[in-house]
Amino acid sequence: MSGRNVFKMGFLSAVAATGLFMASNSFAADSHTTSKFEGVKANTGMATHGRQGNNDTLTWSDEFKIPDTPAPHWQVVDSKGNVFLLQRLKIKGDKENRTITIPSYVHDIAKVQIYCAWAEALLGEASFAKPVMTASGEHMHSNSMAMGR
């Protein structure tokens, strides 16, 4: 192998490594984790926000235990204090809504709560360090910036 080929291989390897590093950082930037759930019934685990394309998701951690209540649900609170009741944690056939897609009408998420819809009681909550902007919120924000020009 000539010196020129060795140089090309080394250079291409460095470019590939840089690309992989940048790609992994961009994926990590779209993932946010809450504090630990704290409450009367939900007090283990955390929730993670992720994004797949234009869909925002919430997933609970492996440590999370579904509270033993009649109708525990996902619930989120935005930075303005608006509360959005979302899917049940347990569904038919002993299945679980471990990951849910956030509806487009939710523009940011400050807190993730576990709520019992039957008893109308908050079972526990976890907060993000700062509110997480959803894809629909980013779209609204960019449109309002364009209108202000």
Question: What is each residue range found by the language model?
Answer:
Residues 2-14:
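Bacterial N-terminal signal peptides that target proteins for export
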Residues 23-25:
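N-terminal signal peptide c-region/cleavage motif recognized by signal peptidases
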Residues 27-53, 86, 131-148:
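Transition segment at domain starts
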Residues 58-64:
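Short amphipathic, basic-aromatic surface patches that mediate peripheral association
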Residues 73-77:
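Beta-strand signatures of extracellular beta-sandwich domains
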Residues 78-82, 118, 132:
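Solvent-exposed strand-loop boundary residues in beta-sheet-rich modules
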Residues 80-107:
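An anionic, turn-rich surface loop/hairpin at beta-sheet edges
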Residues 102-127:
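Short, exposed beta-strand-loop hairpins at the edges of beta-sheets
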